[in-house]
Structures are given as structure tokens and as C-alpha cells.
Amino acid sequence: MIKRYTRPAMGEIWSEDAKFRNWVTVEAAALRAKAAAGEFAATIPDQLESLVAVVAEEVDRLEREKTRHDMKAFLELTASQLPAELQPYWHDRMTSYDTEDTALGLQLRSSVQEIRKTLTGFMAALKTRALEHKYTPQIGRTHLVHAEPITFGVKLANWYAECFRHFVRLDYLEQRVSVGKLSGAVGMFTLDPEIEARTCESLGLKPVIATQIVSRDII
């Protein structure tokens, strides 16, 4: 994203550091799901995510100098920070896009929520001004020429109605993008589907049918 054209909140959602934090969130959720399914008995710290520090520059350095693969660099950096008894299960039987696309679902959901938050403020301003100018006259126009008189408040109320429809669309879009997958490299489940279901539920996502990646028609 080009910084000068990006709102700060949206820039934070799509920053490299935020991306890797979301990867940690997904990996931690999958680890807990595996434990809940009885795959191992080791204790998982309640604040596991806060124990794993990941900095984009360090991941990039490892990728450039050693792994030649962003996920391998991420896993090398993060697994080493886990208790030894948990390390074998971190990313176990998962493919890169189990982590990346599930994290993408978190980013997309946050983005829709941020857009809706901004739209809510804009709609409140439109409503205030529409009522304020309820009786403020202006000329109506058709085909860019003067027509019958209207009020400026009516014009603003029309814009408010359009924004309300956009608001409804954003609600639907949030549901559509809030998906994840842990179905492996070709969608045939190297992990029990119950682990995918548990992981997604803990993240507020819904499992989606996928191959290696989640189809981009969700956007």
C-alpha cells in the first residue's frame, strides 16, 4: 500500500507486522484445536500469542539470507520461542496457505469493520445536515438543467439512503470474507476437519471449501 494514500487504521491492518501477528494468531488457534482434539497433552500457556515476538524485518532477513521462503522464515523464528514440548506441533500437517489465507480472513474482516466504522460516522453527519437543511431551498436539476425546487435536506437524505444500502452490503461482505481453512495443500485434510472447525470457530471465522488457497471470489 502507498502510505500517503492510506488511512492510518487501514495501513496498520495491512502492515507486514500485522500480517505476521495474524499468522501467530492462526497458528496458536490451530495448536489449541489440536490439543482439544487430544493430539497431544502438553500444556499451552493462556497468553501464548504474547510469548511469540515476530518482527517483519527479521522474517525478511531470514527469508533473504537462509530460507528463501517467507513461511519457513516465520516458522523458524516463531517455533524457537515456544516451549520445547509444543514445537513439534506448531504448524504440524499444515500448508502455508492454511495459515496465510485464514489470517487473510482476519485482515479482510478488520478492513470491512474499519470501512463500516467510517461509513457510520459519515452517515451520522449526513443525517445531521439533512435535518439541519430540511427547509433550505435549492433548485432541482434533471439533465443538468434547472427543474422544480427541492431542499438541500432532501438531497442529503437521498445520499443517506444510498449509504444505508452500502452499510447493508458491508454486513454481507463481512460474513463473506470471514472464512478460514486448514484443509492442507490440496484441500484433502491432512488434519481432522474437526480441527479446522475448532480453529475457525475460535477466530470467529467459518470454514470454507478450498484447494490450496481460498478462492478470491469471496471479496
Task: Put a short name on every predicted segment.
Residues M1-F189, P193-E201, P207:
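A helix-coil-helix interface module used to build multimeric assemblies
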